[in-house]
Amino acid sequence: MKLIKSTLFISLSLIAAKGFAQYTDVINSNRPGASRSAFSVGTNVLQFEAGPYFINEKRTPAPSYEVEGFGVDFAARYGLLWEQLELNVEGTFQSDTKTYTSTIDAEDKRANFKFLTVGAKYLVFDPYKNAEEDKPNLYSWKANHKFKWKHLIPAVSVYAGVNYDTDKNPYTAVGIEGFSPKVMIATQNNFAGGFVFITNFIKDRIGTDQSDFQYILTLTHSFSPKWVIFAETQGIKSDFYADNLFRFGGAYLLSENFQLDTAMTLNTKDTPSVFGVNFGMSYRLDFHQDPYKEIDNGTSAKDEGQRRSRRNKNKKGDSDLINSKQKRETVDFN
């Protein structure tokens, strides 16, 4: 019973910390999904997220082909100046072999960045800020898990970044090279019971022939202080590529600053079909310090002078009272 209470207390504390502040006592990673949290890593926190993956794509209708290879997703995130601000570098590098399955098979070995982006994210609205009444109730499981309408109001952040695409990149449309802007709106709802719902709405490579729109919906559930599972759907729409991807996976908190994760990606079409598996890790260098708040404990020179003045007045009053008593006692009535 004590173990259950301790586990419940730790879980609620972590959920509360994640809900009411940018900085959290444990690492807050975007992995292993593709969505981005509305919250930053916290000021003076440098965080690295990376993971290799294996990919298989197969197109059945003509022109038919099959892709097999591997890649790595990576990100570096840093909280700068304010709790709401995060600077980040993100990208995916892939190396594969594309085999055209026609009368005469032909192979095309490819390797390049699928995307490489530098940007900044800023939290513009935080409904959980200063929400004292939403802190966990250590005496009521029901109170901690009941639905509250205000939880439907999400935290909202905005993102702006710049893509860089190299010339003759096999993973982009013909003629896509150089720099192009990327913008995103991210929302996050922290529900009771360890559920978190994240949405991303993205406009990528704006102003190019491959300007696509994406949405990502992610639901995560933390069922213990160490384990979390997630399900995610991602829609991509552009003239170059369109797809609906689904991801499932989980993560394990190895320590306060180190997380391991894995996920599976698939879709439901054959132009091409997609199947991928990834394994990853997230690690942070935590130099965060809570902002200093000056506490008035009455030790200023002015306060000390006022206290001494009051003490002197009290001493003088006591002295006058004693002298008065002594005078009354020495009166001669004879």
Q: Where are the predicted features?
A:
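Positively charged n-region of N-terminal signal peptides that target proteins for export
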Residues: 1-6
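Bacterial N-terminal signal peptides
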Residues: 7-15
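Sec/Tat signal peptide C-region and signal peptidase I cleavage site
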Residues: 15-21
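Transmembrane beta-barrel domains of Gram-negative outer membranes and organellar outer membranes
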Residues: 22-206, 210-263, 267-334
